[in-house]
Amino acid sequence: MAKKVVAIIKLAIAAGKANPAPPIGPALGQHGVNIMMFCKEYNAKTSDQAGLVVPVEISVYEDRSFTFILKTPPASVLIKKAAGIEKGSGEPNAVQVGQITKAQLQEIAQTKMPDLNANDIEAAMNIVAGTARNMGVAVVD
């Protein structure tokens, strides 16, 4: 018989930097999960993505065991990395803070494809381009 899920916890954690301190500790602790075990497994699985924020969806079962699914990093994080900027524009329509090429846009869309609600790469590129525009990052040829 399948184990009963008692909670689904969604967190966005820096890759390879999970530790029992807030926000991870309290979120998992209230469901009785072994926090150190989660941190070790998460850090091991995300060690190759250093510098990125990797969202994770943790399913906690009634026997206090857990499984987790790693999502793709947020488009905004990937865009900031590609453009080489610290943060997006405060006034995206007035102030441009950086630019990315179509090739970089396609690479980001390819990375985000599993988590986007898009049927093909063109639609995914449009979604990512919209995110870039809202951050004050121009897409150039």
From Swiss-Prot:
Q: Its domain of life?
A: Bacteria
- Cross-referenced SMART domains, in alphabetical order? RL11
Signal peptide (from-to): none
Q: Which GO terms describe its cellular component?
A: cytosolic large ribosomal subunit
Q: Reply yes or no: does the keyword Ribosomal protein apply.
A: yes
Q: Which gene encodes it?
A: rplK
List the PANTHER family hit by this protein, alphabetically.
Answer: 60S RIBOSOMAL PROTEIN L12, LARGE RIBOSOMAL SUBUNIT PROTEIN UL11M
**Quaternary assembly:** Part of the ribosomal stalk of the 50S ribosomal subunit. Interacts with L10 and the large rRNA to form the base of the stalk. L10 forms an elongated spine to which L12 dimers bind in a sequential fashion forming a multimeric L10(L12)X complex.
Please list the GO terms describing molecular function.
large ribosomal subunit rRNA binding; structural constituent of ribosome
Q: Does the entry feature the keyword Ribosomal protein, yes or no?
A: yes
Keyword annotations for this protein, in alphabetical order, are: Methylation, Ribonucleoprotein, Ribosomal protein, RNA-binding, rRNA-binding
- NCBIfam families to which the protein is assigned, alphabetical: L11_bact
Pfam families reported in the protein's UniProt record = Ribosomal_L11, Ribosomal_L11_N
Name the chain's protein.
Large ribosomal subunit protein uL11
Identify its protein family: Belongs to the universal ribosomal protein uL11 family.
Source species of the chain:
Acaryochloris marina (strain MBIC 11017)
Tell me which Gene Ontology terms the entry assigns under biological process. translation
* Function per UniProt: Forms part of the ribosomal stalk which helps the ribosome interact with GTP-bound translation factors.
PTM per Swiss-Prot/TrEMBL: One or more lysine residues are methylated.
